């Protein structure tokens, strides 16, 4: 289990309160699909994913990205119990969707980059470290069913 300090929790929740989940979520998933094109195979029903502009403008990518980032709201509310919080999503992604758990780590890293671009100077090294810790812990929780 990962322990978050009071300072880390404050850094995460402060930024979360200012985040445009729809915009950052769509951009995060879109960038994942552009930078790691093999991840597109899990989104066959999303329509046109033929180019970066098609991916980033795709309404299904944006909608699912929002859904993914919204689940981080659950992580933020339950930072001390991520394994339980993501148990059902872990089972879904493992048993039904057969998603490579490495993709969770990749998406987390893309999310951190997107946050940095959205928040600029406010995204200090301390804030980055806290968010990196969170996305890593969420990736581990989502991959739990695989072990």
From Swiss-Prot:
Oligomeric state and interaction partners are given as: Heterotetramer of two alpha chains and two epsilon chains in early embryonic hemoglobin Gower-2; two zeta chains and two epsilon chains in early embryonic hemoglobin Gower-1.
Which Gene Ontology terms cover its molecular function?
A: haptoglobin binding; heme binding; hemoglobin alpha binding; metal ion binding; organic acid binding; oxygen binding; oxygen carrier activity; peroxidase activity
Q: Which GO terms describe its cellular component?
A: blood microparticle; haptoglobin-hemoglobin complex; hemoglobin complex
Q: Which PANTHER family match?
A: HEMOGLOBIN FAMILY MEMBER, HEMOGLOBIN SUBUNIT EPSILON
Q: Tell me the protein's name.
A: Hemoglobin subunit epsilon
On the tree of life, the source organism's domain of life is Eukaryota
Which protein family is named in the record?
Belongs to the globin family.
Q: What does this protein do?
A: The epsilon chain is a beta-type chain of early mammalian embryonic hemoglobin.
State the Gene3D superfamilies in the record.
Globins
Residues that the record marks as modified (Phosphoserine) are 14, 51
Q: Which SUPFAM superfamilies match?
A: Globin-like
Q: Which GO terms describe its biological process?
A: hydrogen peroxide catabolic process
The record's section on PROSITE patterns has:
GLOBIN (PS01033)
């Amino acid at each position: 289990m990962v322990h978050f300090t009071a300072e880390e929790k404050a850094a995460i929740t402060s930024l979360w309160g200012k985040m445009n989940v729809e915009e950052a979520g769509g951009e995060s998933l879109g960038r994942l699909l552009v930078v790691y094109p093999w991840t597109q195979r899990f989104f066959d029903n999303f329509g046109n994913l033929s180019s970066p502009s098609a991916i980033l403008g795709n309404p299904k990518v944006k909608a699912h990205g929002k859904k993914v980032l919204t689940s981080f709201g659950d992580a933020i509310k339950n930072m001390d119990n991520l394994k339980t919080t993501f148990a059902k999503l872990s089972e879904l992604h493992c048993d039904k969707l057969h998603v490579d758990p490495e993709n969770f780590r990749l998406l987390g890293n893309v999310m951190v980059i997107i946050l940095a671009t959205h928040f600029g100077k406010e995204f200090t090294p301390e804030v980055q470290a806290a968010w990196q810790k969170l996305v890593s812990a969420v990736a581990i929780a989502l991959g739990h069913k695989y072990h």
